[in-house]
């Protein structure tokens, strides 16, 4: 009995070590994908993936060559169930399982599918087993016919594309380098542009701002007449002397 318990402890320790290595490798890979997604290269990603694959292979090898009593013959039973938060359990599971209650224990210790999923799987298996050979062969033939039709369409499209690519002389030119250079020279340097002869008809003469600002407002009017004098005001004013005594003083 002691020998079997010792072998079981050794097996569990080896499995836990391999699981910790696997968890660490997965965490490192996820961290790199989240932080180094712009600089990570394909060989580095393949190296991380190969490391995870090696840990999985080692874990499967340990489980396949079990030492002592096979794990599938053992039963895991909870020692204590409580609806309260267990800090020791939270620390032991690295924050994943805070409570080990009556409602959660079956889900954590379940080794078979959910009863509803198991019943649906059994119904599908029974339906597949009740299918006759003729019906199954007919369905397989229809499936192969659909696959062949899709394959023919893809193959024909591939052949048409290859023929079109082989017969195409090349990329058709849609621009002229000479015309582009002439346009750039005309816009940037004015090459090829001629100025009009004589002043344009109907255009006014522009006066520089300095001349406009320095000219007085009493300049000659556009009609050539002299500026108009001061117009007489129709309002009569009565200016009194300042030394006149106010009547209300």
Swiss-Prot record:
Signal peptide: none annotated. Component of the Mediator complex. InterPro entries: Mediatior_Med8_fun/met (IPR019364). Residues 1-26 form a coiled coil. PANTHER family: MEDIATOR OF RNA POLYMERASE II TRANSCRIPTION SUBUNIT 8. Component of the Mediator complex, a coactivator involved in the regulated transcription of nearly all RNA polymerase II-dependent genes. Mediator functions as a bridge to convey information from gene-specific regulatory proteins to the basal RNA polymerase II transcription machinery. Mediator is recruited to promoters by direct interactions with regulatory proteins and serves as a scaffold for the assembly of a functional preinitiation complex with RNA polymerase II and the general transcription factors. Residues 215-249 are annotated as: Disordered. Its main location: nucleus. Belongs to the Mediator complex subunit 8 family. Gene3D superfamilies: 1.20.58.1710. Residues 215-224, 235-249 have a biased composition (Polar residues). It comes from the Eukaryota. GO terms for biological process: regulation of transcription by RNA polymerase II. It is found in: Nucleus. One of its GO terms (cellular component) is core mediator complex. GO terms for molecular function: RNA polymerase II cis-regulatory region sequence-specific DNA binding; transcription coregulator activity. This is Mediator of RNA polymerase II transcription subunit 8. Keywords: Activator, Coiled coil, Nucleus, Transcription, Transcription regulation.
